[in-house]
Amino acid sequence: MKVQMIERIFLIQLCLLTVVLASSRAVVEFESTGTKLVNSLRVLAAYSQSSVCVDEKISGIERQIEEVKDMYGNHSFILKGLNGILNNKVNMLTREIQMETVGNNTFETETGKLTKGLNRAVNISPFKYIKKFKTVSTKKFESLLNKYDLVAKKGGELTEEQKKKKEVLSRISRVVAATTIEAGLAQGVVDLCITVTTSLCLVSASIGGVGFLIWLTIIYQALT
């Protein structure tokens, strides 16, 4: 019994360490992408004929990138998602530069899009969307469970198959309701992934993930 307890404690510590390391890597990757993005903007600025202060605009983008990093630095899942979107933007700008399709107004257009997208990342909370989908899913599970309970209240008896379905639904419902997905997605399900089956853990993470993807789409639309 003591051996099992020690093993479980060790496993939990290992998982938490993995989360911390993943968070650190996510920050480093995000910083690297931010640097590439700023460098691309400086190249675009060379083509610009606008009288607007280039350095001021680029400094504004740098401040926004730093603000996003500080805000989501402890949420590697979120930072990785944003990093993917910004990295896509870097690749797009790189192609434009290589193909020499940069126009006189490209710098102003792209800095405007980036300002808008990063502003959304800061001012629109991803947790709002994650929590909304979690709440909707929890209510759906409760509704399904109530149907089985209604059969019992009417004096009926569930079949073996129905009993199994109810048990699975009940377990998933508990995981979804208890998991603090809105507090950090991957980080929030660490302990539950240790104590319940992997499939249930993935279900709970996926439910929050739907809301997260919608949030990323809102930012992506601003950047494009």
From Swiss-Prot:
Residues 27-174, 221-224 are extracellular. Coiled coil: none annotated. It is a multi-pass membrane protein. It is found in: Membrane. GO terms for biological process: ascospore wall assembly. The keyword RNA-binding does not apply. Residues 196-199 are cytoplasmic. The chain crosses the membrane at residues 175-195, 200-220. It comes from the Eukaryota. GO terms for cellular component: fungal-type vacuole; membrane. Disruption phenotype: Displays increased levels of spontaneous RAD52 foci in proliferating diploid cells. A combined deletion of the LOH1/OSW4 and IRC18/OSW6 has reduced dityrosine incorporation in the outer spore wall. Keywords: Glycoprotein, Membrane, Signal, Sporulation, Transmembrane, Transmembrane helix. Glycans are attached at residues 74, 104. Induction: In respiratory-deficient cells and by heat. Residues 1-26 form the signal peptide. Belongs to the OSW4/6 family. Involved in spore wall assembly. This is Outer spore wall protein 6. It comes from Saccharomyces cerevisiae (strain ATCC 204508 / S288c) (Baker's yeast). The gene is IRC18.
